[in-house]
Amino acid sequence: YKRQIADTLGAYAKEKGVTLCFHPHYGTCVFWESDIDYLMAHTDPRYVSFCIDTAHTTLAGMSPVELIKKVGPRLAYMHLKDVDTYALKTAEGADKMGTFRALGHGTIDFPAVKAALEEIGYDGILCVELDRPEVGNFHSAEVSRIYIRDVLDI
């Protein structure tokens, strides 16, 4: 019945011009690679898409680059968020959310993420997400904007 619910919601959303998009996220029912694989195998790609979040993908022990390639044409939305995997090794529970960083100040290989997005022909939205910035919202947004412009050339 779960597949039927997702496909039914996705079909209804599509009729209304909206894309049903699952965002694998820490602390939710769709987070681990096995959850994503199950959802991909048991839902209709015409109706169920994905939002990949680079940091949450990393928290789940996956490579954002490999997940982008796996999801391929089902990728409808993209969250760019950095994470410090060194701090993540000692973080427990909700403290894992405190390991997020401004773009370029964590350990995610964003040039490789950009290359994977280009490889699958993704031309959708890239949303920079800053959860619990270390210094402050404005500073973290500015640092991330500079990184996107100067390093990723976006």
Language model regions located:
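Active-site acidic/histidine proton-transfer and metal-coordination neighborhood
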Residues: 2-50, 138
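Histidine-acidic metal/acid-base catalytic patches
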Residues: 33-52, 58-154
